[in-house]
């Protein structure tokens, strides 16, 4: 990925980095980390936060719809990620930065409340890109990815290791967000509504992702970031997540 390589090169050379994304598939165009292939496996490495971001929504609109769905999945994940971070602080494993929380919350709330008729509407794409960009800023303020990456991202990172050919990051994250929102019992109606009404679930169902892979990923999730303490770092919540994968009505139409 050009942006990831550019961010990492800027980090190594200590140079300013201007991000010009051509799709809205994730918040990667604004974050201070890069996803690179290392020995054939996708790996997160430190990178340079964008000095500036230039986005042409006409270009974003012409990208395949799967990239928009991926961006939707990555954006909605801030709901469960923030809840994980707050839970982590309650358990004594972290210290929440309230300003970073405020920015990440405003980003996701602005997005989910945007009126639209099509995911290719100008306003919808603008809000999606703006909100994804704000996510990167929240991470920079927090000094970590905690405001925007929680248990749902751990499932996706585990899938990256399990699958020979992983799906788009935001697609995996979106499904994992639905799972974790129900495990957390937190805003799951909002998450389900957004993913259903945008067509995300319908698209995800065409990919024929496997239940067994998600179950393996849930078990593997804590080992991805052992220094964190998300809901999935506790066995009872892992069991609840796996039960959902096997029994949830929505997931029964998506996973095979």
Annotate each predicted stretch with a short phrase:
Residues 11-107:
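A glycine/threonine-rich phosphate-anchoring loop and its flanking beta-alpha core
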Residues 2, 54, 151:
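Generic enzyme active-site microenvironment
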Residues 75, 185-256:
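C-terminal charged capping/lid subdomain of soluble metabolic enzymes
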Residues 6, 27, 62, 158-159:
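Generic hydrophobic alpha-helical membrane-span motif
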Residues 79-88, 143-146, 183-190, 227-229:
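Short helix-capping/linker segments at secondary-structure and domain boundaries
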